[in-house]
Structure formats: C-alpha cells, structure tokens
From Swiss-Prot:
Active site per database record: D13, H41
Sites where the protein binds Mg(2+): D13, G40
Residues engaged in binding IMP: D13, E14, G15, K16, N38, A39, G40, H41, T128, R142, Q223, T238, R302
Pathway: Purine metabolism; AMP biosynthesis via de novo pathway; AMP from IMP: step 1/2
Keywords assigned by UniProt, alphabetized: Cytoplasm, GTP-binding, Ligase, Magnesium, Metal-binding, Nucleotide-binding, Purine biosynthesis
Reported function: Plays an important role in the de novo pathway of purine nucleotide biosynthesis. Catalyzes the first committed step in the biosynthesis of AMP from IMP.
Reaction catalysis annotation: IMP + L-aspartate + GTP = N(6)-(1,2-dicarboxyethyl)-AMP + GDP + phosphate + 2 H(+)
Protein name: Adenylosuccinate synthetase
UniProt record similarity statement: Belongs to the adenylosuccinate synthetase family.
Residues noted as binding GTP in the record, renumbered to the chain: 12-18, 40-42, 304, 330-332, 412-414
Cofactor: Mg(2+)
Gene Ontology molecular function, alphabetical: adenylosuccinate synthase activity; GTP binding; magnesium ion binding
Binding site for substrate: T298, T299, T300, G301, R302, P303, R304
Length: 430
C-alpha cells in the first residue's frame, strides 16, 4: 500500500494542482475528498494549460482512476460544462468515477448563497457565490439531494418538491425574493445527471479495493488548511474540511491507510476574499509579487492578496494535518527582490506568540515578527538541482524548512512540470 495526501498549507492557491498532476504520474488512483467548483486548479499538460474546478488532476492519464469523492458537493451544470471542456480539447474522461453519495448543488443553493451574503453587508465572508455553503448546510440538516437521488427520477422529484417548499418559504418571507419553480430545475438537472450517470458508483469501494491491491493512491485536496471549517480563520473559511482529516470522511477510507501528507505552500503567501492576513503587503513589492506570480483567482478572476511567507501559518497546518513533507512552489516569483522577509512569530498584546490564534479579532491585532534574508537576482527558472540554486535562494528555502519543521520533498521554479524538482520519491518511501 502506498497513499499520499496533498493538502494546501495556506489559504489555497498554493499550486496543489501542479504538484498533484506531477505526483499523478506514478499513482494508480487520484481522488478528491472535499469542496466543489469554488476552487480551481491550473495544470500544464503537453504544453497546454487547463483550468479545472471539479475533476481531479489525474484525468489526463487514461490509465488512472480519477475519483470525485463523497465529501464533495457537485454542481451538475458545472460538471457537464467541465466534461465538455475536456472533450472539446481531446481529453478522454472514461477514467472518471463519481461517488453516489456526493451531494448535489442546485440553483436554490446559489440563490441562498447570494441572498445570505448580501444580507451580511460589511460582515460578508467573501464567498464565491457557487452555493457551496448552503449545499453543505442541507447535507448537515439531512435535507440534501445526493447523486444517487439525482439519477432516480422519482426520488429526485419527490425530494426536490420537499426541499423547494422549505427554500421558497425562506426566499419569499425572509428575503422578499422570488420563489423558484419546480419546473425551472427538475427536467434540466435530471438530464444533466443522465449525462454523467455512467461515472457514478460507490467510490469508497473502488479506492479501498485499490489500496488492498497495493496500488498507489493520491488524495487531492482543494483550498487550504487556513480555509478549513474547523482549523481555518473562522468564519472566513470554506464549508468543508480542507485539512488532511477530510480524507477519511470525504473518500471513505480509514485514517490508518494514509502514508504521507504533503503540505503545499508558496515561497510567499496569498489569499482570495476577506479575513485576517497578518503578513499582507500593500506596497510596490506586493504589487510585483502579484503581477509576476499571476495572482488572480482561477475560479473568480479576483486579484489575490499577497504577503510574506508566514511560518506560523504553516506550522499550524503541520500540526492540524500531520504534515510529513513540504512542497515549496513559486520560488522564482521572488527573484529580484533585494531583501526578503519571513514571519517567524506574532506579537500580540505585548507578548510574542508562536501559535495561530483561534479568534479572528485576536489575529487582526497580531503584528508579524520578521526575519530578513538577502534575495537573489539570477534567473532560476532553468534550475533542476537544489545545489544549483543561488546560495541566497538555497538559504531562503532551508530557512523555511527549518522554521516550519517539515522536510522538503519538492520545490518548483516555474509553472511547468519540468520546473518541479523532486528531492525524494514518496511512493518509494511509503
């Protein structure tokens, strides 16, 4: 058995898709375990760039099973659109598998998302308005509609009528919005379900059978630990468990079956949306990092907020996700910056703290404590060995590994797969 989890250690957008795609080469199964189409990942394959939101990165390898696990919430319309996007570019999806227990996002979830966000005013969380949160709410309230329901016309109709009655009461009475008609959803979304029905199965059985056979399984996370419902900067978080703990429940495997947990981070920090960000940069350096790093959301197109590397954040992720290995991306983006800074701790109420506060108000009051390191000017995008990096770049990477307490397994000096340098083979170690 050999299984590896890839998890973001910051606020998402760390380059997980790139690393997952890279690790997919040796995997037999690639499985997503949480989230929905609110998070995107960009993959460069055969010199072409693809942007995916739901389908796992391993889809480009026809010999690998690609699993959308039960922990995801799936928008059927988005899924059909993404399947067409791949088919139009000559990519087969015959290797895709979708859990029959995954919950389905329907138009009323998106409307609810929009109305709730508008009602919050200045206290809004900054949701992508994709209906993710409301769908997870229905799941917890036990009124959700799952893939197995969507594919059965009678069951889908029965459940949809019940849920719409509740939702429309809320829309009209609480928000003074228009009701959604049954006919506006039913036939269209039932038809979507029929388009991908051939992919739907009990994916927990598939993944566990693969592990029993000794096959290599890669679990692909979305977002990052700081957006995790329990361990993130609550309430500025997503509605699922983006930490490694989400794998067990989101795919249906026992936690003892996980061998490695790879934490992915950038050589700096970024986030989309509202919420505390202690090391955020508002100056010319921040602008440079954003433009050089193309820091714009894959899903929303929104400019990302950027800042210095925060070791407090990544240590928090190490503890809560049990990180065993570190994958460091986008080192090349920092080229040309004369002096680099790494946050080593926070100052809060006159005291130095090393752990991440639970209260977002406390976090907003934290002042980062920085350590400065000299930068480098040399172009490093062609580097393929750690020892070939400029000495200042080597020292910067080593300091990140030291401060986070995580052993480096890969680093990247550009967006291409060939620009990822592997220091150890995780599958051989498992």
């Amino acid at each position: 058995m050999s299984s590896v989890v890839v998890v973001g250690t910051q606020w998402g957008d760390e380059g997980k898709g790139k690393i997952t795609d890279f690790l997919s080469k040796k995997a037999d199964v690639v499985a997503r375990y949480q989230g929905g189409d609110n998070a995107g990942h960009t993959i460069v394959f055969n010199n072409e760039t693809y942007k995916l939101h739901l389908i796992p990165s391993g889809i480009f390898y026809s010999d690998k099973k690609c699993v959308i696990g039960n922990g995801l919430v799936v928008n059927p319309k988005s899924l059909v659109k993404e399947l067409k996007y791949l088919h139009d570019r000559g990519v087969s999806t015959d290797n895709l598998l979708i859990s029959n227990r995954a919950h389905v996002i329907l138009p009323y979830h998106q409307l609810q998302d929009q109305l709730e966000e508008e009602a919050k005013g200045d206290a809004k969380v900054g949701t992508t308005l994709k209906g993710i949160g409301p769908c997870y709410m229905d799941k917890a309230a036990r009124i959700g509609i799952r893939m197995a329901d969507l594919l059965d016309k009678e069951t889908f109709a029965e459940k949809l009528k019940i849920v719409l009655e509740q939702k429309n009461r809320m829309f009209t009475k609480m928000y003074d919005a228009e009701a959604i008609a049954f006919d506006d959803i039913f036939e269209e979304y039932y038809a979507y379900g029929q388009e991908f029905a051939k992919y739907v199965c009990d994916t927990s059985v598939v993944v566990n059978d693969s592990l029993d056979k000794g096959e290599k399984v890669l679990f692909e996370g979305a977002q990052g630990v700081l957006l995790d419902l329990d361990h993130g900067t609550y309430p500025f978080v997503t509605s699922s468990n983006a930490s490694a703990g989400g794998v067990a429940s989101g795919v249906g495997v026992g936690p003892a079956r996980i061998d490695h947990v790879v934490g992915v981070c950038k050589a700096y920090t970024s986030r989309v949306g509202d919420g505390p960000f202690p090391t955020e940069l508002f100056d010319e350096i921040g602008h440079q990092i954003r433009e050089v790093g193309r820091e714009y959301g894959t899903t929303t197109g929104r400019p990302r907020r950027v800042g210095w590397f925060d070791s407090v954040v990544v240590r928090h992720s190490r503890r809560t996700s049990g990180l065993t290995d570190l994958s460091l991306n986008s080192i090349d983006v920092l080229t040309g910056i004369e002096t680099l800074k790494i946050c080593t701790s926070y100052e809060f109420n006159g005291k130095q703290i090393d752990e991440y506060p639970a209260s977002f108000r406390d976090l907003e009051a934290c002042v980062p404590v920085y350590e400065e390191l000299p930068g480098w000017k040399e172009d490093i995008t062609h580097i393929r060995k750690f020892e070939d990096l400029p000495i200042n770049a080597q020292n910067y990477v080593k300091r990140i590994a030291d401060l986070t307490g995580i052993s480096l397994v890969t680093f990247s000096v550009g967006p291409g797969r060939e620009q990822t340098v592997v220091l150890r083979d995780l599958y051989e170690e498992a």
